[in-house]
């Protein structure tokens, strides 16, 4: 499927000509050509990110082309403090449909999800550095992955299939320098670990769920609720319920501690701890619609893995030092127990503080 509509914007210039005796108004039409997004399902993935025309102008500026809409989960997946920008594009005349609050929107064939990973204040130049862009493209046979690595000049990103590693140093808001070996996923295997349901061979996106995007973000025409924006633009069927049970920003202290914890677990843990997920055999289920039962989050629950000194309990109420869940989120060097096992080498300090407060409150 190719979206090759010749997109042209017609700007109306109103020229008011004033004379001593009369006035008139004249309309002039200026046609400005804009390259259309290209996503031919018989040809993708393309060798270069620029081949899709997702962005206008200099690629590194990430200025979305017409039809490429940003979206953002209210709480995001942690990836060693990488910053992220997300976009969705759909072929002309297609739209997604609502399934339920907690399931991914049913996106049409030809839809593309775009996720850009970058850091600010990268040393030694204290500049922004884009590392990778991941695409999920929906073909008639299902979703495929495409991984693009940005060059040092930040002018292009090239398709790869193997994992890569590069050292990144950046300065945080307290001027502390962090250095990591940033590793990109091996597409044909590691992407599946989070996105696949092995009980039915289903591959699906993760974050673009009504419960996660039911809040406002800034668009070029101002702030707007993301679901409303998708409907307004013609990307989402207007069949949503009046009320959507939604996750919250895990750092929003105006929300209850329990809601914040459940929201963090939902976006960071659910994709593995779900029926058919990589950790389906464990007794934990972190989906937001399931964690009204605290045992689903491991409270007082028997742990699947033995860890000496922890009494084999996932979460021991009031005691972080007897809670295996806390240890697995806290450790940076125990590769057997680090959680999650992919995409994290740094401790997520803000989340650790949240989990400690939660466990101590139980």
PLM regions: where:
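Short, structured beta-strand/loop micro-motifs enriched in basic residues and often containing a Trp
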Residues: 85-98
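Bacterial N-terminal signal peptides that target proteins for export
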Residues: 2-11
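Sequence context surrounding c-type heme c attachment/ligation sites in exported
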Residues: 25-33, 104, 122-362
């Amino acid at each position: 499927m190719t979206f090759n509509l010749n997109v042209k914007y017609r700007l109306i210039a109103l020229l008011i000509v004033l004379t001593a005796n009369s006035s008139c108004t004249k309309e002039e039409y200026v046609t400005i050509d804009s390259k259309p997004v290209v996503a031919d399902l018989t040809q993708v993935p393309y060798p270069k990110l620029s081949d899709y025309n997702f962005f206008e102008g200099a690629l590194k500026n990430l200025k979305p082309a017409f039809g490429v809409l940003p979206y953002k989960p209210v709480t995001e997946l942690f990836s060693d403090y990488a910053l992220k920008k997300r976009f969705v594009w759909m072929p002309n005349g297609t739209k997604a449909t609502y399934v339920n609050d907690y399931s991914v929107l049913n996106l049409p064939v030809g839809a593309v999800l775009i996720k850009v990973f970058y850091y600010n204040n990268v040393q030694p130049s204290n500049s922004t550095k884009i590392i990778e862009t991941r695409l999920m493209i929906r073909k008639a046979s299902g979703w495929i992955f495409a991984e693009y690595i940005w060059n040092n000049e930040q002018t292009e990103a090239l398709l790869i299939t193997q994992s890569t590693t590069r050292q990144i140093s950046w300065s945080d808001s307290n001027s502390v320098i962090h250095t990591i070996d940033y590793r990109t996923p091996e597409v044909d295997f590691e992407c599946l670990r989070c996105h696949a349901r092995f009980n039915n061979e289903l591959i699906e996106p993760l974050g673009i769920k009504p419960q996660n995007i039911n809040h406002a973000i800034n668009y070029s025409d101002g702030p707007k609720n993301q679901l409303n924006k998708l409907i307004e633009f013609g990307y989402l069927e207007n069949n949503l319920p009046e009320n959507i049970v939604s996750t919250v920003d895990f750092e929003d202290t105006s929300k209850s501690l329990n809601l914040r914890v459940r929201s963090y677990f939902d976006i960071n843990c659910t994709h593995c701890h779900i029926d058919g997920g990589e950790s389906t055999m464990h007794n934990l289920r972190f989906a937001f619609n399931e964690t009204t039962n605290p045992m689903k989050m491991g409270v007082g629950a028997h742990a699947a893995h033995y860890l000496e000194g922890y009494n084999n309990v996932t979460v021991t109420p009031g005691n972080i030092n007897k809670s295996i869940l806390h240890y697995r989120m806290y450790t940076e060097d125990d590769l057997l127990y680090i959680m999650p096992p992919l995409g994290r080498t740094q401790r997520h300090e803000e989340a650790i503080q949240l989990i400690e407060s939660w466990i101590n409150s139980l």
